[in-house]
Amino acid sequence: MRQRLLYLLRFYLLTVLTFIAAKIVFMLCHAADHPFSASDVLEVISHGVSLDLSTALYFLIVPFLLTVASLWLRLPRWLFVGYYVLIAVAFVLAFVSDTSLYAFWQFKLDASWLSYLETPTEAMASVTVGYLLLRLFLTMVLTAALTMLYIRIAGMPSYGHHSWREVLLDVVFIPLLVIGIRGGFGESTTNIGQVYYSQNQFLNHSAVNPVFSFLYSMSHQMDDLSQYQSMDDSLCSQLLEGVYTTESVAADTLLNTTRPNVLIILLESAGEQFATVMPHLQQLKKEGVSFSRCYANSWRTDRGTVSILSGYPSFPKISVMKMPEKSRTLPSIALSLQKRGYQTSYLYGGDINFTNMRSYLIGTGWSRLTSMDDFTLEQRHTSQWGVRDDITFNTLYEEIVKCALRSDEDGGKYLWGYSTLSSHEPWDVPQKTLDDEVENAFAYLDNCLYDFICRLRQTPQWENLLIVLTADHGIVYKDIDNTQPLQKNHVPMLWLGGAVREPRVVSRFCNQSDLAATLLGQLQLPHADFTFSRDVLSATYVHPTAVNNYSNAQWLVDSTGQILYDFDVRQSSISHSTDAERLLRLNKAILQVTTNDLKNR
């Protein structure tokens, strides 16, 4: 038993050390373009090791199974050597490819390089024969060297007998292996974003394990997007004419300044279906600009967050936030304001590594992140998902007042983002005002929000502040489900603060994703790169629509009615429109054009 454990431990540690060595070599190879210090190397290793530990466990599965089999069978030596050769080839190919391609791509190895195999001539056109031969030579030498290391250090397991203790050990080892691969017991599973820690993207990229990066992107491929191709692209363009207009022309003016400090709050799951238990929010609507027919783009926080902050559409079966190679190409409100001198920060009281949130936020211009790890141990466990909302609202208040005081001194501008989390299963909140636990959680959120607004209103910083309130998505609750999309997907969109010129209601159909263009239009800033975000107040917004998708279905509403099309069964489950055929074609065209854009990023 002891010898088997030592064998698995030797194999595992050698794999982890190989990954760490690859990080150091990667950094050294790019030192000329990306200088770093010795402390940077240590930080890259310390932040990246969690991903290395989990990735190494994937490759421990085969040795573990072989050692189990060896209790009953005398396995030939070539089985182990063959596996060592196989993983050595895989590792070295990943390391060499990653290190070589980074100079061209400036992002980590992912599955996108496979597309170049279809046109190898074009792929090799930008490099010399010597360049290729050198890398081929290095691959062969390093593969041989790594194989020898596995043979000499990991070696071969000794053969044992299938005693009950040996079998029990194997049974216990299996869940430990699964937990390690998953990344622990938390809500967040192992993902690339967990190793991001710096505003220097090179250091973040250095921390990422290239083998994991490739496997992760392979598991999030978009091969099934072909099912959304239903017509010629020229017909799509014709159908979409006037639907996605990016210009701000003669836009109505909502603000009394073009350079306010901006706060964007994403209210967890707080769809309009909970309006009756959120009376304070309804009162606030009378004091600001309420977009009364705003609809969520999707049904999950990761997708809604991207739609709100990047003005980008969501997709039925894909989360763009979970695809760093795609999300890093997106525009964002933060990037646009950062270019105008705004300092940006984001607060989320939960695990910011969940669904790759960290890498998305850093990659789209949010300079300073605050998450549950920045709170006390006691505060981190005040909610199932992390730090409960009354605590984080207070943290946000203190941050705004502190930053605004600095702004008064140096004239700087600020953009804050904040995601609440308590109004989510299991609905564990400290107050008990309603018997229904779900409604009680939203009443708690309503109280937290109102207390925050009242406190902020008493500060001098209120005068130049624009607060944008919206929900990340709606939820299925009681009799409101996916068969009632008008109710389920309806979310608040409210602009508040001293920067708002006067209260009013904007009653046009719109999506969360239209916030980016509408806000930047009000700030008189360009937003042409937000291809699918529309300035709702612009004279060019002549065809108001809203879209939402979930699972493998997409819903569309405009002035003629609504339609919900299920791509699994290839038929509409809802079709209530005076122009149903046109609306169906438009619905398909929207998804075809947006998925084409995603594939090309």
Please give the residue ranges for each predicted region.
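Short, Lys/Arg-enriched, disordered terminal segments
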Residues: 1-7, 405-410, 599-601
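Transmembrane and membrane-interface helices of multi-pass
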Residues: 2-223
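Residues that form generic nucleotide/phosphate-binding pockets
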Residues: 48, 52, 126, 152-153, ...
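Short clusters of hydrophobic/aromatic residues that line enzyme substrate/ligand-binding pockets
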Residues: 123, 427, 536
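Short secondary-structure junctions
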Residues: 159-161, 368-369, 543-547
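Soluble catalytic regions of membrane-associated enzymes that act on cell-envelope
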Residues: 186-530, 540-541
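Membrane-interface soluble catalytic domains
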Residues: 190, 499-601
